[in-house]
């Protein structure tokens, strides 16, 4: 077990997998922060102007979907880097 782990690190696949995991993790964290900021701004806008809640909600969902799509693409690319 330990020998196989050491051989993986020695050949470089261990470091590649570490980079893959770090890249995917950073992409997901960034997407989470971005979607949180979108939600925060939407709630502030709805609180200021309740009559525009439908339009604000629709724009919020579209923006969150775009951010989530970019995050999913980044995770897939990180998965195929090896």
From Swiss-Prot:
Write out the GO MF terms.
lipid binding; proton-transporting ATP synthase activity, rotational mechanism
Compartments where found: Cell inner membrane
Which sequence ranges are marked TM in the entry?
18-38, 61-81
By its UniProt entry, which Gene3D superfamilies does this protein fall under?
F1F0 ATP synthase subunit C
**Superkingdom of this protein's organism:** Bacteria
Q: Which InterPro entries match?
A: ATP_synth_csu_bac/chlpt, ATP_synth_F0_csu, ATP_synth_F0_csu_DDCD_BS, ATP_synth_F0_csu_sf, ATPase_proteolipid_c-like_dom, F/V-ATP_Csub_sf
Q: Where is this site: Reversibly protonated during proton transport?
A: 68
Membrane topology label: Multi-pass membrane protein
Q: Which GO terms describe its cellular component?
A: plasma membrane; proton-transporting ATP synthase complex; proton-transporting two-sector ATPase complex, proton-transporting domain
CDD domains (alphabetical):
ATP-synt_Fo_c
Q: Which Pfam families match?
A: ATP-synt_C (PF00137)
Q: What is its main location?
A: membrane
Q: Which UniProt keywords apply?
A: ATP synthesis, Cell inner membrane, Cell membrane, CF(0), Hydrogen ion transport, Ion transport, Lipid-binding, Membrane, Transmembrane, Transmembrane helix, Transport
> Keyword Signal on this protein?
no
The record, for NCBIfam families, names:
ATP_synt_c (TIGR01260)
| Chain's role | F(1)F(0) ATP synthase produces ATP from ADP in the presence of a proton or sodium gradient. F-type ATPases consist of two structural domains, F(1) containing the extramembraneous catalytic core and F(0) containing the membrane proton channel, linked together by a central stalk and a peripheral stalk. During catalysis, ATP synthesis in the catalytic domain of F(1) is coupled via a rotary mechanism of the central stalk subunits to proton translocation.
Listed under subunit, the entry gives: F-type ATPases have 2 components, F(1) - the catalytic core - and F(0) - the membrane proton channel. F(1) has five subunits: alpha(3), beta(3), gamma(1), delta(1), epsilon(1). F(0) has three main subunits: a(1), b(2) and c(10-14). The alpha and beta chains form an alternating ring which encloses part of the gamma chain. F(1) is attached to F(0) by a central stalk formed by the gamma and epsilon chains, while a peripheral stalk is formed by the delta and b chains.
The family note in this entry says: Belongs to the ATPase C chain family.
Q: Identify this protein by name.
A: ATP synthase subunit c
Record organism: Azobacteroides pseudotrichonymphae genomovar. CFP2
């Amino acid at each position: 077990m330990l020998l196989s782990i050491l051989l993986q690190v020695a050949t470089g696949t261990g470091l590649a997998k570490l980079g893959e995991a770090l890249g995917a993790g950073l992409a997901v964290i960034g997407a989470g922060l971005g979607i949180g900021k979108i939600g925060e701004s939407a709630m502030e806008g709805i609180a200021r102007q309740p009559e525009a809640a439908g339009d604000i909600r629709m724009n919020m969902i579209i923006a969150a979907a775009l951010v989530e799509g970019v995050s999913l693409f980044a995770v897939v690319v990180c998965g195929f880097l090896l």
